[in-house]
């Protein structure tokens, strides 16, 4: 499955949801098993998590028909450590992670396209590609090292 997601702001929960644009694969796929880990708590989304899909580094909720929880997608090349993470983020997105301001859906779409989608399509599989949770997601990440605590610290 190619990285084709659309940003949808859920005003009721004040979170950004990323939903698959279509079920068809486009562009270069990311091979390998999903290898989903069981959630730490009872799932808050339906169990149809799309285990047949082959994206690595995604939480279980990423393939739910209800849509994934609020996520930020980035590559390890752009964020080598959690210490310098804010230097690689647009200022408004950094503020959004700290709850200081909202970022428009258009700005977020541009950020995702520039930082992630182009990279996936041009370079293909990126072994060090990781997914970090902005907040509100209780699902474990697949193939992820130690949890990122940058977004929960002030």
From Swiss-Prot:
Biological processes per GO annotation: DNA-templated transcription; symbiont-mediated activation of host NF-kappaB cascade; symbiont-mediated arrest of host cell cycle during G2/M transition; viral genome replication
CC per GO annotation: host cell mitochondrion; host cell nucleus
HAMAP family referenced in this protein's UniProt entry, alphabetically: HBV_X
Taxonomic lineage: Viruses, Riboviria, Pararnavirae, Artverviricota, Revtraviricetes
Compartments it resides in: Host cytoplasm; Host nucleus; Host mitochondrion
Quaternary structure, from the entry: May form homodimer. May interact with host CEBPA, CFLAR, CREB1, DDB1, E4F1, HBXIP, HSPD1/HSP60, NFKBIA, POLR2E and SMAD4. Interacts with host SMC5-SMC6 complex and induces its degradation. Interacts with host TRPC4AP; leading to prevent ubiquitination of TRPC4AP. Interacts with host PLSCR1; this interaction promotes ubiquitination and degradation of HBx and impairs HBx-mediated cell proliferation.
Pfam families, per database record: X
Underlying gene: X
Family listed: Belongs to the orthohepadnavirus protein X family.
Covalent S-S links between cysteines: none
Primary localisation category: host cell
Role of this protein: Multifunctional protein that plays a role in silencing host antiviral defenses and promoting viral transcription. Does not seem to be essential for HBV infection. May be directly involved in development of cirrhosis and liver cancer (hepatocellular carcinoma). Most of cytosolic activities involve modulation of cytosolic calcium. The effect on apoptosis is controversial depending on the cell types in which the studies have been conducted. May induce apoptosis by localizing in mitochondria and causing loss of mitochondrial membrane potential.
Alphabetized InterPro entries for the sequence: Transactivation_prot_X (IPR000236)
The keyword Transcription regulation is assigned to this record: yes
Region (Mitochondrial targeting sequence): 68-117
Keyword terms: Activation of host NF-kappa-B by virus, Activator, Apoptosis, Host cytoplasm, Host G2/M cell cycle arrest by virus, Host mitochondrion, Host nucleus, Host-virus interaction, Modulation of host cell cycle by virus, Transcription, Transcription regulation
PTM comment text: A fraction may be phosphorylated in insect cells and HepG2 cells, a human hepatoblastoma cell line. Phosphorylated in vitro by host protein kinase C or mitogen-activated protein kinase. N-acetylated in insect cells.
Organism: Hepatitis B virus genotype B2 (isolate Vietnam/9873/1997)
Full protein name: Protein X
